[in-house]
Amino acid sequence: MSQLRIFSYLPNPRIWKATIVARLAGVDLDVRGAAPKELQSWLWDFDARPLSAAEGTEASEVRGHAGFQGKLHKTAAFLEAHPFGTVPAAFSPDGKVGIFESNSIMRAVARLAGDKLGLYGKDPYEASRIDSFLDASLVFARDSQIYLLALGSGSLSEEIYGPTRDAFATYMNGIDGALSKGRKFIVGDRLTLADVCFVAEFALFNNEKPRARDLKTRGLEPILSEKLDQLFPHAIAHFARLSKHPAFAPDVVPYMEKIERATAK
């Protein structure tokens, strides 16, 4: 039996926060899901699966939230476990306890392992500093999600672009500064949840690359500029290095290769 079940649209770099930590710490996960469009015909439940006609009449119909259009089929049990009704949605093995938001799901995986590797810091001070970086990522994550959805739907405006550009610069400056002076990790002297979170969020934002031409036709410069290595050298090198790590590579490498192929078209 898995120690944690996760339901989400796939692929989803924010799920990597859990899968990477699970590989590092030896936690057994059960990940279920499908492409965003397919989830409209899924039953949103602990036992998430493609929806049958009979189940469709029993499940609650809720209008789609960010990233989804139309109605979604959510059971009462799903909504009780996940009051905000969003994915990724994690569950305890019995399905009674719901855990939501990717950073919290990642923390849960570390806790399930007893965190023998110090992924959540070696003491309360480091743990709190890690939390600080995770909280900072939430500001960038919110803006990046709105930005990428607008870019994909052709509804991008300067009101969305400007704040996202600024949020990206703020986030990357903070990460780059934390990695300056020869530091190998964002917090302390070992790999932590802060590093895992950074890799996931930066990889997700790379979905801007295939839309670079669309941006330029609107008179906007890609936020992921060609000078990224010069602007944030430590952060970019850190991402490249961790992408090759055995716990990261199974998620990161195929995803980034797919983005590069789409960008080259």
Language model features with spans:
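GST-like domain detector, emphasizing the conserved glutathione-binding G-site
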Residues: M1-R165
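GST-like fold's C-terminal all-alpha helical module
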Residues: G121-A240
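Primarily interfacial, aromatic-capped hydrophobic alpha-helices that serve as membrane anchors
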Residues: A240, K244-P250
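C-terminal helix/juxtamembrane-tail motif
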Residues: F248-K265
